[in-house]
């Protein structure tokens, strides 16, 4: 299980019917079944009742020190057991609401608002044996678990024998079988549904609106997740209606424990506020096998049933559906899905929901996983670097691996995700504490509630039982299904018995009853400031503290408060030639393979999520998110005028003083916190009317702002911008006019606008370098006006900052009278920036804060009253509440001075005492007599006594408190017998694929333990079954199939990013020690058909140069000579054109009608002269001549491979010579070691330019040789680099050449080149120029240049004509369409626009539109969009006002049912003012005494308008006019007085002085005083009407 999931054993025991009826327990799950008859006794063991329901236990006041106790006694195996139990008041809150819904009709909804206090916890005692813990529910008999002599025993009533009045109800007690040790791993899994982009954009937009309210530091605050849990009808059908409630609470308690684990890094409480149990299917909630549809239906349904307002006790923040349906990813398959939720959907009314499939107690991990997705947590390894290492288990792993002895925890990435989610303010709904009516969890360890057999029945059905001696139960739970043992690779839950006096806890078998002590977390000290995240350009340093002193353990509280601080550093700007910080982060991925290739990554800006790292491969448009968060200090918006930077993945605002969230701004000329007094505006007009080309208009200096450049009137001229470098233009340079738009110029953005012929340039600035304004003259200039704002010259030079201490204003006086204290605080000031952080000033020179007294006039006297003391009597007359009353005056904030009562005479004196409990009659008491003798002589008898009500108060005695009149008495034992009732089996089950071991299973015979050789191996990720491993076969009759599956947690996030944006060549072939793609590998024709090989196919595209090893075509039996080929330069014009003049047209320029590269024969390029197409020409290239002798080329290494980079050479034997035949084609060939010419029967078409450097040579005309060389042609194969021609054409043309001569054999034998004699009168001959190689852009033309003698050496090389030159017809232009703009309206019909430009395809330089007119039609620039009808806005109820008075703000949720489909202009307000009335209220005192005992009197009370903030009365009562004025008087004693003749008063009965004092104190109104002092207190006059019937004025 999980470290941190340590459930306190002192809380809930068993809810009613947790274990199910007795008939549902399989006989193999019980041992030692006994029948007992428990009775209720008192603390001393005296009999009280056969009735086990503790009706006398009533829940006392919450402040009661201890709960009521109950005692039970029973005889078990001849031993007398005494149960001492106490009520568990914390299982459910007083306002617990459990709804049972039937047939979707509200009238049939049963709501349980209270539960009986029949859940008891305590211990069992035995005089001899060791007792232990007991958790018993006494709601319907005794049902639960207790420990005796370190063994677990279960007790429950016998259903076959109902309880009889006056008789003890029979119960059965049975032991729980112990299990062996096990060990293995386990897997389980769920998957979150990704949140929609609309939701993410909505959240980001909300975050930006809340920026001003957010603090810069990271604060750890307690969060309360108020949860609605819904159990569907399948759950009720499976578990049974009485049991499902306790089962669900047990699951949710385990989930709450997971979220209390310290590894999550935040104090989060999972609280169930509402539980809905669906006995029938809901009309509006359709639960199907299709997981997506079920989640969608449930999210809609839970939103409708949610209570409005966070303050409602049953309002929930998230909803969880638990179902027994077998969930499937799609309609019918795959069906291994266990859970579904929306990522980052928490607190969203429509998306804060999840669905989980019930598979037994491991359901808790599924619920925790899906709830983690709602917190915005991604799977570990998905978009982050927290992929599970080995088998280290994490809760958010895509496939959870439960390693032995290692509990599930939260990974570092999960902690960062949830912290970022909360710091962004996306969890505002979690800030409010739950109201009354919250459900408390059962905190008994789940293994105590559900033993191993019960856990097996939950997973596999009623007939399943625990397989003993298979593995350690704390690691893996194995259950029987038929004759085999199955396992879902889950460990048994905490509290499961794993041996004698032991249970499982955190994956380990520990002594039973062991519960680690709860330890609350404590903050460590602040760490040192970290290294600055950047060396320039505003970096971030941070200091943080951890909740590690100590680390919270065992349900201890997590630390609350500030956990991280930030400070900016290295504020100086970076060098301009350095790439951006975001670009540097993208380039870190250049060395990583992406789709099988290496790419150069460039950044892509993302305004919706500016702090995520989005990049794309250079020259490709598709983008990828490479990191979830950029490094601290990365600008949020690259290229904009903004200082905002990213910190921990959140965009933080930076003021001009470079303090986070300071709000400091610059004035219009760049002075931080300035008032514009130092700004100077420069305005000039350029009036030269005539000019040629580009003419300077004026210079805008660096630091200029509010720049405006415009033509005075329309003209055909063009504005241009350039830097101080004459060759560097920002706009409209190089005689090219650009389109309207925004252009980056000198560190700022200029907006270029042209309406008709009138041009304007605007920019907010500031410029980082001087910018020249130019005018490109086309006609007469009507004038150009420009202006800008800059700081005055005296302040333009950069000055070092000056920091000093300054006093701020005096604080407000905290009191209105009685002397208060005002303080004057110090601030650190900078001369230009104003108030800055105190760290910039010298602390040694810091002056002291100033103080002074204020409002020293004395406060008026007022009555001070203390708290009411308890009533002096609890019943009957004569009891009083009393309190102290003093006249005091405030002389300070915390000091009061006592005065004489006369000083408060202007105020009515509050009452010092009032009667209490006089209406409560005191109860009577019971009296008891002595016990009689026992009624029997042996065994159990009865003795009696008398019980009487001692009635001396006139109140009957309480029957519930009446003592018993009879009790048991026990003498020497009598013999008696017991009977045993056998029962059937019950439980629950499921059918899902799982790992199982087939075992010859016998429920009555233990399964033998595997031998050490068959110890389990680590679980593999694959599904392969190793059937041949002998170590997997245990000895004896047990055999293990080990069919393993790993799909409990299915990853719904399919990796769609691997779609190729180009062909991926990931398969590589090793050729000659080099790894090359497969499309470059040499071809391999059949070995009996040697084929001459030209350049390797694809070598030109891949840019691969060098020698190619030959295909292994030649065998020792082959008589055909091999042809040696090498790769050649890619471009035939490389020798004639410079790099600047090389043909450039479209992005991939190819020369028309030329096969390139030409065939190469051992480094010599072969071609055919136009005059004689049948000659195979060999180009001389002395630079490629190897220095090694010809014979060295045939040397082989020991393994038979040729040495050196060249191919195998020709054999040394000469070619046989025969006379030439006119019908056969002949070819000259110089058989030097570096050049071989062969007759192929093909015509090779090559670039004519090369023929100037070629010379004809002749090959032998031996038919045998020709047959051998032409073999490839006759068999239909051809070299990849040669172009065949028909044989007829070849033969015809070759017969026309008289210069064809056979080779001399000696030349071939010697291997020497042929020497040709120089010709006389030779001259250069040129052919016609070819057409331009391109139709647009920069191309090339060439011509044939050759010597008339056929040998270039006969002609003068210095006078050789140019064979090629470049040509340029026109620019290659094409329409380039930009991205469509955002639709002007999301619904109701809108339009989107885009920019369409005519550009040069070479460098994407903008051109005038006429360049593209010959081509395709210009693409449209506008299209319709957002045609769907608009939906109405959804508004929630208003939340509680932020202030109780004095003006506050109310908020409500305003959202669109379908994001983007609502009219933005009609969006309702989400805030409104509230409680605008002043902070005053009427305060009333207690009603005074009635002015008359009868005949109509008046009661009066004090009514004052009091300021609730100061606690003082307001002089103006109109300030309380927002409340109804309470009555200050009311009539009383309206009954008529009896007409009794007053007795004659002779004298006062009390002493005269005492009566005079009472009269002065106003006591004569009291009837008793008036009767005792009849002379001093004359009777009331009846002639004057009472003022009690008059309305007293309000003021």
Swiss-Prot record:
CDD domains: ZnMc_ADAMTS_like
InterPro entries: ADAMTS/ADAMTS-like, ADAMTS_ADAMTS-like, ADAMTS_CR_2, ADAMTS_CR_3, ADAMTS_spacer1, MetalloPept_cat_dom_sf, Peptidase_M12B, Peptidase_M12B_N
Residues annotated as domain Disintegrin: 444-519
Comp. bias (Polar residues): 1268-1280
Tissue note: Detected in liver, ovary, kidney, testicle, lung and embryo.
Keyword list, A-Z: Cleavage on pair of basic residues, Disulfide bond, Extracellular matrix, Glycoprotein, Hydrolase, Metal-binding, Metalloprotease, Protease, Proteoglycan, Repeat, Secreted, Signal, Zinc, Zymogen
Enzyme active site: 370
Principal EC category: hydrolase
Tagged with keyword ATP-binding: no
Coiled coil: none
Post-translational modifications: Glycosylated. Can be O-fucosylated by POFUT2 on a serine or a threonine residue found within the consensus sequence C1-X(2)-(S/T)-C2-G of the TSP type-1 repeat domains where C1 and C2 are the first and second cysteine residue of the repeat, respectively. Fucosylated repeats can then be further glycosylated by the addition of a beta-1,3-glucose residue by the glucosyltransferase, B3GALTL. Fucosylation mediates the efficient secretion of ADAMTS family members. Can also be C-glycosylated with one or two mannose molecules on tryptophan residues within the consensus sequence W-X-X-W of the TPRs.
Bias-annotated ranges (Low complexity): 1220-1232
Domain remark in the UniProt entry: The spacer domain and the TSP type-1 domains are important for a tight interaction with the extracellular matrix.
Protein's UniProt name: A disintegrin and metalloproteinase with thrombospondin motifs 7
Species: Rattus norvegicus (Rat)
